[in-house]
Regions:
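Boundary-proximal intrinsically disordered activation/regulatory segments immediately upstream
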Residues: 1-51
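Short gly/ser-rich anion-binding loops that grip negatively charged ligand groups
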Residues: 23, 62, 71-74
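A generic secondary-structure signal marking the coil-to-beta-strand transition
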Residues: 23-24, 44, 60, 79-81
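Short beta-strand elements of ligand-binding domains
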Residues: 48-49, 62-64, 85
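Short loop/helix-cap segments at secondary-structure boundaries that form the rim of catalytic
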Residues: 52-59, 75
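Active-site regions of enzymes building and remodeling cell-envelope glycoconjugates
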Residues: 56-69
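Hydrophobic alpha-helical segments and helix pairs
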Residues: 70-87
Length: 87
């Protein structure tokens, strides 16, 4: 379950000043997240829909509803997962 504070934090990361202040950034989509996981970026947290929950093998994951994912996504049609990485 995603708290309101987490939703506010992730939504704030759409703006550059908050990404710099929190030293975090957002990645959306399975392919982009997998590429970042294979690189040197450190995963802060991963939010996935129930459909993708079993296919992800990290311990830092949370199931998120489609409605909440739509709230925090920068895309008009959100993907099934969203990750927050440390800069």
């Amino acid at each position: 379950m995603v708290s309101k504070n987490q939703i506010k934090l992730i939504s704030s990361l759409h703006q550059k000043k908050y990404r710099i202040a929190h030293q975090l950034f957002i990645a959306e989509g399975v392919k982009g997240i997998n590429e970042l996981l294979q690189s040197n970026f450190e995963l802060e947290h991963l939010y996935v829909t129930i459909d993708e929950f079993k296919s992800v093998s990290t311990t830092q994951k949370t199931v998120i509803s489609d409605a909440d994912l739509k709230k925090i996504s920068a895309l008009t049609t959100p993907n099934t997962c969203l990750a927050v990485f440390k800069i």
